[in-house]
From Swiss-Prot:
Complexes and interactors: Gamma-delta TR is a heterodimer composed of a gamma and delta chain; disulfide-linked. The gamma-delta TR is associated with the transmembrane signaling CD3 coreceptor proteins following the stoichiometry: a single gamma-delta TR heterodimer associates with one CD3D-CD3E heterodimer, one CD3G-CD3E heterodimer and one CD247 homodimer forming a stable octameric structure. Upon activation, gamma-delta TR complex associates with FCER1G to initiate intracellular signaling.
One GO process term, biological-process aspect: adaptive immune response
Alphabetical UniProt keywords: Adaptive immunity, Cell membrane, Immunity, Membrane, Receptor, T cell receptor
Species: Homo sapiens (Human)
Record protein name field: T cell receptor gamma joining 1
Gene name of the encoded protein: TRGJ1
Amino acid sequence: NYYKKLFGSGTTLVVT
């Protein structure tokens, strides 16, 4: 599992 910060949108994509 990892968390990748989506720059610009300011949201976080959570991939398990």
